[in-house]
Amino acid sequence: LIGDNINEKRLKEIGEEGVLAMICDSTNVFSAGRSGSELDVRKNMLNVMSRLKKRIIITSFASNVARMETAFYCAEQTGRQISLVGRSMHRIYKAARQCGYLKNTIEPIDPREAKNFSREKIVYLCTGSQGEPMGAMMRISSYVHPDVFIEKGDAVIFSSKIIPGNEKKLYKLHNQLVKDGIEVISEETEFVHVSGHPNREDLKEMYQWVKPRCVIPVHGEHRHMIEHLSLIHI
């Protein structure tokens, strides 16, 4: 949905020309099969948002422009305005627009203006999906955000994966929202997130195409990178 499809033909040509070393992501090396599609997330997100009749808050990684576009698309399809909350969300949106993305989406409205819309006509896309203390989601859930408030019957969609180490504070946040009568939707309950990192089969196929003489595993804990090296020898 964002950017061009992978150029398999060119990667295979590069592999035939000879590659000394390849640096590759280890994050999802323990995940079987292939990583999913953002298009599938978009379809399910639309189904989820269509059934929700109150205020919706979506929290995700600001850097995930494809997910941002999904939020804009689903807001428009469900007859809602969308408002961005959080400095990094605004910064990434501006950068994406400057690079030619998000051109065919509705214009976001200011959170202060969003307060004038009825609950079923607005969706907020905010930062803080990992429970960051100063993230917009934490401030909203603590009822200290100056422009965005949440109340019983509303819904929060955590459209992101829990980064290892953040489990305790995120589940605490989930529990607090549920206690306040707010519906919590996450990848545990609905298909609202797909990883942008390659799974095991994706990694295997890439190495078959590129055929590097050396592999440098990165982006993961030590156990991920050791497993990545083991995968190469399977």
Region spans (language model):
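His/Asp/Glu-rich metal-coordinating catalytic cores
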Residues: L1-N116, G135-D147, K168-L170
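Short, glycine-/Ser/Thr-/acidic-enriched flexible segments
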Residues: T27-V29, S63-N64, M89-H90, S129-E132, ...
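Generic long, charged, amphipathic alpha-helical segments
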Residues: G181-G196, D202-L203
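Redox- and metal-dependent alpha/beta enzyme cores, enriched for Fe-S-associated oxidoreductases
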Residues: V148-I150, K161-G181
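Conserved small/polar residues in nucleotide/adenosyl-binding loops
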Residues: I232-I234
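Glycine- and other small-residue-rich loops at beta-strand/loop junctions that grip anionic moieties
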Residues: G33-R34, T59-F61, V192-G196, P217-V218
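Proline-aspartate-enriched helix->loop->beta-strand connector
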Residues: V19, K54, L203-G220
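Generic beta-strand/beta-sheet core signal
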Residues: D25, T59, S83-G86, L125-T127, ...
